[in-house]
Amino acid sequence: IGSGPCTFISETAGTEMELGSFADYHLGTPKFGKLVLKVVSASNTITSVAAGEMDAFFQSPSMDDALAAKDLGMNVEEAANPTSVVVFLINNQNVPDKRIRQAMSYAIDKELLIEQNMRGNAVASATCIIPGSEYDKGIAWSRDVDKAKALLAEAGWDGRTLHMVVTAARESMAAVIQQNLADAGITIDVQTVELATMFSGLQDGTYDLGICGSNAMVYPLWMAGYYDYRNATYCQISDPKLAELQDTIAAEIDPAKKKELVNEYQDMLYDEMPLVILYHGYSFAVKSDRLQGFNAFEGGVNNEKSWN
Protein backbone atom coordinates (compact mmCIF):
# COMPACT_ATOMS: atom_id res chain seq x y z
CA ILE A 1 0.00 0.00 0.00
CA GLY A 2 1.40 3.38 -0.87
CA SER A 3 1.31 6.52 -2.93
CA GLY A 4 3.98 7.73 -5.31
CA PRO A 5 7.46 7.51 -3.76
CA CYS A 6 6.32 6.07 -0.41
CA THR A 7 4.88 2.88 1.01
CA PHE A 8 2.69 2.78 4.10
CA ILE A 9 4.14 1.25 7.28
CA SER A 10 1.99 2.38 10.20
CA GLU A 11 -0.10 5.20 11.61
CA THR A 12 -1.12 6.51 15.01
CA ALA A 13 -4.24 8.51 14.20
CA GLY A 14 -3.75 12.24 14.61
CA THR A 15 -0.20 11.83 15.91
CA GLU A 16 2.25 10.03 13.66
CA MET A 17 2.64 8.17 10.36
CA GLU A 18 5.55 6.02 9.18
CA LEU A 19 6.29 5.65 5.48
CA GLY A 20 8.86 3.55 3.68
CA SER A 21 10.82 4.08 0.48
CA PHE A 22 9.19 2.63 -2.68
CA ALA A 23 11.95 0.91 -4.65
CA ASP A 24 10.00 0.93 -7.94
CA TYR A 25 9.00 4.60 -7.91
CA HIS A 26 9.15 5.84 -11.53
CA LEU A 27 11.37 8.83 -10.67
CA GLY A 28 13.84 6.67 -8.78
CA THR A 29 14.02 5.14 -5.32
CA PRO A 30 13.82 7.82 -2.60
CA LYS A 31 17.05 8.14 -0.67
CA PHE A 32 15.63 7.32 2.74
CA GLY A 33 14.74 4.12 4.51
CA LYS A 34 11.91 5.43 6.64
CA LEU A 35 10.06 8.74 6.74
CA VAL A 36 8.26 9.58 9.98
CA LEU A 37 5.63 12.33 9.86
CA LYS A 38 4.62 13.77 13.23
CA VAL A 39 1.97 16.25 14.29
CA VAL A 40 3.47 18.92 16.55
CA SER A 41 2.42 22.33 17.73
CA ALA A 42 3.49 25.17 15.44
CA SER A 43 5.15 26.81 18.43
CA ASN A 44 7.43 23.76 18.88
CA THR A 45 8.80 23.35 15.36
CA ILE A 46 12.04 25.29 15.75
CA THR A 47 12.83 23.91 19.19
CA SER A 48 12.11 20.36 17.99
CA VAL A 49 14.64 20.68 15.15
CA ALA A 50 17.15 22.34 17.49
CA ALA A 51 16.76 19.47 19.97
CA GLY A 52 17.26 16.83 17.28
CA GLU A 53 13.71 15.53 17.68
CA MET A 54 12.94 16.11 14.00
CA ASP A 55 14.85 17.03 10.86
CA ALA A 56 12.47 19.44 9.12
CA PHE A 57 8.85 20.55 9.07
CA PHE A 58 6.37 21.11 6.28
CA GLN A 59 4.94 24.51 7.16
CA SER A 60 7.27 27.39 6.26
CA PRO A 61 8.50 29.15 9.39
CA SER A 62 7.35 32.64 10.15
CA MET A 63 9.82 35.49 9.83
CA ASP A 64 10.21 35.55 13.61
CA ASP A 65 10.86 31.81 13.73
CA ALA A 66 13.42 32.02 10.93
CA LEU A 67 15.28 34.81 12.72
CA ALA A 68 15.16 32.88 15.98
CA ALA A 69 16.55 29.81 14.24
CA LYS A 70 19.40 31.87 12.79
CA ASP A 71 20.20 33.17 16.26
CA LEU A 72 20.42 29.56 17.44
CA GLY A 73 22.94 28.82 14.69
CA MET A 74 20.56 26.52 12.85
CA ASN A 75 20.51 25.69 9.15
CA VAL A 76 18.15 28.32 7.66
CA GLU A 77 17.67 28.65 3.90
CA GLU A 78 15.83 31.37 2.01
CA ALA A 79 14.16 30.65 -1.32
CA ALA A 80 15.92 32.20 -4.31
CA ASN A 81 12.56 33.09 -5.85
CA PRO A 82 9.12 33.81 -4.38
CA THR A 83 7.31 30.62 -3.41
CA SER A 84 4.06 31.89 -1.89
CA VAL A 85 1.25 34.27 -2.78
CA VAL A 86 -1.37 36.24 -0.86
CA VAL A 87 -4.60 37.01 -2.68
CA PHE A 88 -7.38 39.55 -2.12
CA LEU A 89 -10.50 37.73 -3.28
CA ILE A 90 -13.38 39.66 -4.88
CA ASN A 91 -16.83 38.19 -5.54
CA ASN A 92 -17.27 39.17 -9.19
CA GLN A 93 -21.04 38.68 -9.05
CA ASN A 94 -21.35 41.20 -6.23
CA VAL A 95 -18.71 43.51 -7.73
CA PRO A 96 -19.35 43.05 -11.48
CA ASP A 97 -17.71 46.24 -12.80
CA LYS A 98 -14.02 45.66 -13.47
CA ARG A 99 -13.33 49.35 -12.85
CA ILE A 100 -14.32 48.89 -9.21
CA ARG A 101 -12.01 45.91 -8.93
CA GLN A 102 -9.21 47.86 -10.63
CA ALA A 103 -9.77 50.70 -8.16
CA MET A 104 -9.29 48.28 -5.28
CA SER A 105 -5.96 47.16 -6.72
CA TYR A 106 -4.74 50.75 -7.02
CA ALA A 107 -5.99 51.69 -3.54
CA ILE A 108 -4.46 48.84 -1.53
CA ASP A 109 -1.01 49.60 -0.12
CA LYS A 110 0.74 46.36 -1.03
CA GLU A 111 4.14 47.62 0.07
CA LEU A 112 2.83 48.35 3.57
CA LEU A 113 1.33 44.87 3.76
CA ILE A 114 4.69 43.40 2.72
CA GLU A 115 6.53 45.38 5.37
CA GLN A 116 4.08 44.52 8.14
CA ASN A 117 3.57 40.86 7.31
CA MET A 118 6.77 39.77 5.55
CA ARG A 119 9.35 42.25 6.86
CA GLY A 120 10.06 43.18 3.28
CA ASN A 121 10.63 39.61 2.08
CA ALA A 122 8.08 39.75 -0.73
CA VAL A 123 7.38 41.60 -3.95
CA ALA A 124 4.21 43.49 -4.88
CA SER A 125 2.62 41.75 -7.84
CA ALA A 126 0.45 42.74 -10.78
CA THR A 127 -0.84 39.25 -11.61
CA CYS A 128 -0.44 35.64 -10.48
CA ILE A 129 2.69 35.32 -12.66
CA ILE A 130 5.68 35.50 -10.29
CA PRO A 131 7.60 38.77 -10.86
CA GLY A 132 10.97 38.08 -12.46
CA SER A 133 10.06 34.53 -13.51
CA GLU A 134 10.46 33.25 -17.06
CA TYR A 135 6.85 34.04 -17.98
CA ASP A 136 6.70 37.48 -16.38
CA LYS A 137 5.79 40.14 -18.94
CA GLY A 138 6.92 42.93 -16.64
CA ILE A 139 3.59 44.59 -15.85
CA ALA A 140 4.37 46.94 -12.99
CA TRP A 141 1.91 47.78 -10.23
CA SER A 142 2.09 50.95 -8.16
CA ARG A 143 -0.34 52.40 -5.65
CA ASP A 144 -2.39 55.30 -7.00
CA VAL A 145 -5.28 56.42 -4.79
CA ASP A 146 -6.21 59.26 -7.16
CA LYS A 147 -6.54 56.81 -10.03
CA ALA A 148 -8.66 54.57 -7.80
CA LYS A 149 -10.97 57.49 -7.05
CA ALA A 150 -11.21 58.36 -10.75
CA LEU A 151 -12.14 54.78 -11.65
CA LEU A 152 -14.83 54.73 -8.96
CA ALA A 153 -16.27 58.00 -10.26
CA GLU A 154 -16.20 56.72 -13.85
CA ALA A 155 -18.00 53.54 -12.80
CA GLY A 156 -20.62 55.47 -10.83
CA TRP A 157 -19.76 53.69 -7.60
CA ASP A 158 -22.88 53.65 -5.43
CA GLY A 159 -21.05 53.81 -2.10
CA ARG A 160 -22.58 50.67 -0.66
CA THR A 161 -20.77 48.82 2.13
CA LEU A 162 -18.97 45.65 1.08
CA HIS A 163 -18.59 42.71 3.42
CA MET A 164 -15.12 41.25 3.90
CA VAL A 165 -14.35 38.03 5.74
CA VAL A 166 -10.97 36.85 7.02
CA THR A 167 -9.48 34.33 9.41
CA ALA A 168 -7.91 35.48 12.67
CA ALA A 169 -4.44 35.23 11.10
CA ARG A 170 -5.37 37.90 8.52
CA GLU A 171 -7.02 40.44 10.82
CA SER A 172 -4.11 42.90 10.74
CA MET A 173 -4.03 42.75 6.94
CA ALA A 174 -7.77 43.35 6.80
CA ALA A 175 -7.41 46.46 8.96
CA VAL A 176 -4.85 47.94 6.55
CA ILE A 177 -6.96 47.12 3.51
CA GLN A 178 -10.08 48.52 5.16
CA GLN A 179 -8.32 51.86 5.68
CA ASN A 180 -6.75 51.81 2.20
CA LEU A 181 -10.11 51.29 0.51
CA ALA A 182 -11.70 53.96 2.70
CA ASP A 183 -9.04 56.38 1.45
CA ALA A 184 -10.35 55.81 -2.07
CA GLY A 185 -14.03 55.91 -1.12
CA ILE A 186 -14.93 52.24 -0.60
CA THR A 187 -16.41 51.26 2.76
CA ILE A 188 -16.06 47.69 3.97
CA ASP A 189 -16.91 45.90 7.17
CA VAL A 190 -14.74 43.02 8.34
CA GLN A 191 -15.82 39.77 9.97
CA THR A 192 -13.50 37.11 11.40
CA VAL A 193 -14.52 33.50 10.76
CA GLU A 194 -13.03 30.03 10.35
CA LEU A 195 -11.31 29.27 7.03
CA ALA A 196 -14.00 26.87 5.78
CA THR A 197 -16.71 29.44 6.53
CA MET A 198 -14.81 32.08 4.58
CA PHE A 199 -14.43 29.94 1.47
CA SER A 200 -18.01 28.63 1.48
CA GLY A 201 -19.37 32.14 2.07
CA LEU A 202 -17.38 33.51 -0.86
CA GLN A 203 -18.56 30.69 -3.09
CA ASP A 204 -22.25 31.15 -2.26
CA GLY A 205 -22.18 34.96 -2.39
CA THR A 206 -22.59 35.63 1.33
CA TYR A 207 -19.40 37.69 1.39
CA ASP A 208 -17.94 40.14 -1.10
CA LEU A 209 -14.25 40.07 -0.20
CA GLY A 210 -11.68 37.83 1.46
CA ILE A 211 -7.97 37.05 1.80
CA CYS A 212 -6.23 33.73 1.22
CA GLY A 213 -2.71 32.46 0.71
CA SER A 214 -1.12 29.61 -1.22
CA ASN A 215 2.11 28.19 -2.52
CA ALA A 216 3.07 29.79 -5.84
CA MET A 217 4.54 28.26 -8.97
CA VAL A 218 6.43 29.42 -12.04
CA TYR A 219 4.03 27.34 -14.15
CA PRO A 220 1.75 30.08 -15.56
CA LEU A 221 -1.54 28.21 -15.14
CA TRP A 222 -1.09 27.14 -11.54
CA MET A 223 -3.97 29.45 -10.48
CA ALA A 224 -6.22 28.49 -13.41
CA GLY A 225 -8.90 27.09 -11.12
CA TYR A 226 -9.41 30.48 -9.50
CA TYR A 227 -10.38 32.01 -12.86
CA ASP A 228 -12.39 29.19 -14.44
CA TYR A 229 -16.12 29.90 -14.73
CA ARG A 230 -16.72 26.13 -14.81
CA ASN A 231 -15.61 25.87 -11.18
CA ALA A 232 -17.40 27.09 -8.06
CA THR A 233 -14.67 29.68 -7.65
CA TYR A 234 -14.12 31.87 -4.61
CA CYS A 235 -14.55 34.88 -6.91
CA GLN A 236 -17.79 33.74 -8.60
CA ILE A 237 -16.42 34.34 -12.10
CA SER A 238 -18.94 33.78 -14.91
CA ASP A 239 -17.03 35.24 -17.89
CA PRO A 240 -15.59 32.35 -19.96
CA LYS A 241 -12.79 34.22 -21.74
CA LEU A 242 -10.12 33.65 -19.09
CA ALA A 243 -10.82 29.91 -18.99
CA GLU A 244 -10.82 29.73 -22.79
CA LEU A 245 -7.42 31.42 -22.98
CA GLN A 246 -6.11 29.12 -20.24
CA ASP A 247 -7.20 26.10 -22.29
CA THR A 248 -5.39 27.52 -25.34
CA ILE A 249 -2.21 28.07 -23.32
CA ALA A 250 -2.34 24.54 -21.92
CA ALA A 251 -2.71 23.05 -25.40
CA GLU A 252 0.12 25.07 -27.00
CA ILE A 253 3.38 23.11 -27.26
CA ASP A 254 5.52 25.71 -29.05
CA PRO A 255 7.44 27.61 -26.31
CA ALA A 256 7.50 30.93 -28.17
CA LYS A 257 3.79 30.82 -28.97
CA LYS A 258 3.01 29.78 -25.40
CA LYS A 259 4.98 32.78 -24.12
CA GLU A 260 2.95 35.10 -26.38
CA LEU A 261 -0.28 33.60 -25.09
CA VAL A 262 0.86 33.98 -21.48
CA ASN A 263 1.64 37.65 -22.19
CA GLU A 264 -1.92 38.05 -23.46
CA TYR A 265 -3.13 36.22 -20.35
CA GLN A 266 -1.35 38.67 -18.06
CA ASP A 267 -2.85 41.64 -19.90
CA MET A 268 -6.30 40.12 -19.54
CA LEU A 269 -5.83 39.37 -15.84
CA TYR A 270 -4.60 42.89 -15.13
CA ASP A 271 -7.47 44.44 -17.07
CA GLU A 272 -10.28 42.27 -15.73
CA MET A 273 -8.80 42.20 -12.20
CA PRO A 274 -11.06 39.31 -11.07
CA LEU A 275 -8.98 39.24 -7.89
CA VAL A 276 -6.02 41.24 -6.58
CA ILE A 277 -2.65 39.57 -6.12
CA LEU A 278 -1.26 41.39 -3.08
CA TYR A 279 2.26 39.98 -3.13
CA HIS A 280 4.48 37.01 -3.81
CA GLY A 281 6.55 36.10 -0.77
CA TYR A 282 9.93 34.52 -0.19
CA SER A 283 9.89 31.60 2.22
CA PHE A 284 12.39 30.07 4.60
CA ALA A 285 13.27 26.51 5.49
CA VAL A 286 14.79 25.23 8.71
CA LYS A 287 16.29 21.74 8.76
CA SER A 288 18.81 19.66 10.65
CA ASP A 289 22.38 19.37 9.43
CA ARG A 290 22.02 15.64 8.83
CA LEU A 291 19.20 16.09 6.32
CA GLN A 292 20.79 16.30 2.86
CA GLY A 293 19.34 16.39 -0.66
CA PHE A 294 16.12 18.00 0.54
CA ASN A 295 14.76 21.09 -1.21
CA ALA A 296 12.04 22.58 0.94
CA PHE A 297 10.98 24.95 -1.82
CA GLU A 298 9.92 22.33 -4.37
CA GLY A 299 6.87 21.09 -2.51
CA GLY A 300 4.43 23.32 -4.36
CA VAL A 301 0.99 22.83 -5.82
CA ASN A 302 2.14 20.61 -8.70
CA ASN A 303 5.21 18.58 -9.59
CA GLU A 304 6.47 21.15 -12.09
CA LYS A 305 10.14 20.24 -11.62
CA SER A 306 9.44 16.78 -13.02
CA TRP A 307 7.21 18.11 -15.80
CA ASN A 308 9.99 20.36 -17.04
Put a short name on every predicted segment.
Residues 20-25, 74, 78-103, 107, ...:
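A bilobed periplasmic-binding-protein/Venus flytrap-type ligand-binding module shared by bacterial periplasmic
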Residues 22-67, 187:
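Ligand-site clamp/hinge motif
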Residues 43-55, 67-71, 99, 175-184, ...:
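Short helices/loops that flank or line small-molecule/ion binding pockets
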Residues 189-198, 223-289:
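Extracytoplasmic/peripheral linker and loop segments enriched in polar/acidic and small residues
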Residues 285-308:
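Long beta-strand-rich cores associated with HINT superfamily self-processing modules
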Residues 153-216, 283:
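Ligand/substrate-recognition segments at binding pockets and active sites
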Residues 96-179, 183-184, 264:
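Append "and occasionally in soluble cytosolic enzymes with long acidic Gly/Pro-rich linkers
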Residues 1-30, 34, 44, 145-146:
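Gly/Pro-rich hinge or "lid" segments in bacterial periplasmic/extracellular proteins
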